[in-house]
Amino acid sequence: MDRIDSAFSQSSMNSDMLEPDDPRINNKDAKPEQDDEDDLEKNALRQMDYKTRRKHIQQIRIQFNISSLKQRQEFLLKLARALMAFGAPSHRIESQLVAAARILEVEAEFIHLPGVIICSFGDQDLGSSETHFVKCGGRLSLGALHKVHLIYRSVLHDEISASQATEQLETLLVAPAPYSVLFRCFLAFCLSALICPLAFGGSFLDMWISGVAAFILAYLQLYVAGKSALYANVFEITTSIFVSFAARGLSSIRSQIFCYTAISSSGIIGILPGYLILSSSLELASKNIVCGSVKMVYALIYTLFLGFGLQIGSDFYLLLDPTMRRHLEELAASLSSTTSFTGIWLADNGTDGSQIPLNGTWTFSRTIQPQDQHIHEGCYRPPISPWYLKPFPLWTSFIIVPLFSFLSSLSNLQPLKSKQLLVMVAISCCSYASNKIANHYIFNHSDIVSAIGAFTVGLLGNIYSRRMGGTAFTSMVTGVLFLVPSGLSQAGGITASGSGIDIGGAMIAVTIGITVGLFMSQALVYTFGSRKNAAVFSF
């Protein structure tokens, strides 16, 4: 009897704990056991052909740090804003966003125009799309750009979630600049003072004058032009007129202790659109015609403004000093190897008087060639000059080049306490060395010389990125920007010809050579080794 009661109580207890439609009570509704997820994936792979199966296996997926669709879309928008704000290579922005959207499994399309990125997110369930316009302007910031790339790579490697990455990007966007305005003006002073003897043949006195001009220019650019929209429109012309006027006035001193070409060229080196023309050349080489052509035309007009300002400043001083103007005309005539006259030629020793006068232009060559061997990089440097008026010897490049590379990285907002700063300086020094050696053997071809220097930079930067996990773009920027003033000095300087069109043509020749060298080095490095699944963050 006790056994029956216990069995009844056990049965009633089980019936109270289980639902009536539980499969353990009603076996006719029990569902068959589902296959394991691995078995389902194997069955799906078995139905694919070889190429589709291999592509599916190599695809990167987010498995651990999963975020909602809205958070992933916000991350893509914030990433687009950060890349534009910190000066990422414009021809790589669209490919990076597409790679991030593919790995995050977000249906999105991106269109990059100058100053704006159009992001379109699709919804397959509703059959609609949502379009966002990300408008942002900025300048090159190497430290922040390196952090953006680390965040981007952490999300794609499934190390952090999209929501965490969005917060980190927002913190970067609102963070203040690492250096004050006064310190950046001091950096501009040092850079112009160092590039004056290095690339434009300036003397010890010239470098200080060009440094002062660059300090004033940087203060006007960072402080005055940033607060006055009216002055920002005429900033380039006014500063180039001021620098050229001061340089021409100092060079007119009778003892010839200052060089106009060295001071004016190095004084405006901080506002040359070298990076802008380089990015436009890279855009055109990447078949991005809209952005590339717009930036190229803007950079050329910008360069014409600078050339126009330099010419106006020089001519305005010569208008006030006619003696100096006559002296320059006589100097130009004495340096020419030929002399031309236009008129009528008639022989005086004719006997019959029937000679016909000849009308035309007559050119006479000099029997004694002009003494121009003392002109170095457009500056007159006689051997009897004191040490502070002579060009710097070659051994000083071993001191000036690393120092210039170090200060150039700081001026592009690279943090002082970072291991990548040493890599930037090393690559930049290799860039200058290869450029100098190539210029020794190849004459009057600034584009080919710049291509060799850019190939060296690209090779070292991409190998550093592949083998040591660094960011290729930020490590290469200093070396690439070093090639622009070096290439211009090989093309005859910025003010040697006095024409803005010639300056623009020289800059285009240099940047086309840099573009070819960078693309060739990248193609060589990425030909070997495993293929990257994400977009390349390089030039």
Predicted features along the sequence, with ranges:
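Soluble N-terminal domains of membrane-associated systems
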Residues: 1-163
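Conserved NTP-handling cores and scaffolds of large molecular machines
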Residues: 104, 484-487
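Alpha-helical transmembrane segments and their membrane-interface boundaries
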Residues: 139-484, 491-539
